[in-house]
Amino acid sequence: MLNIYNTDLKTNKFEKIKEFKPGSWISLVNPTEEEIKLVCSNLNIEDEFIKYPLDYEEQARIDVEDDMTLFVIDVPVIEEDKEGKSYSTMPLGLIVVRDEFFITVSLKKNRVIDSFEKGRVKGMYTYKKTRFVLQILYLNASFFLTDLKRINKNAENTVGILKKTMKNEELIQLLNLENSLVY
């Protein structure tokens, strides 16, 4: 999915737009090949920086090439199934192109980008690239801390139950919570 956002320089109003214009933010969530080609042709860039974060195993890193900077960070993901919640991470790419465009790339929707798209983050301007990167990093760290607190609380509750009953279910649940901390 391809969305383009811009903050108007005069009014500072954050809005969704249809065209690529300098100072805008391009959000790519599980993009198709056509969407990747559209972004690359309009911004006159190679597709490799866009494709790196689409690899679920991509490592967090910073890469600078010509007039582009790529930040790959891990964002926390909560998935629910019949056994409860599981915590993991996935890569999120932040790309600054010639200090004109800001691109975010992720495999699926996530809380970090969703917070910005829905206007929940105050003082966010698409044309202030460094500030935007720092705001994303700060919000991402906040989500990690929140999730770690939840995991710790669940682990403590499960340990308390284990002390009383020692059943396999609680032991498996505790092991699953401990495995979440690896991410």
State where each predicted segment sits.
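Peripheral, non-transmembrane regulatory/ligand-interaction domains of membrane transport proteins
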Residues: 1-183
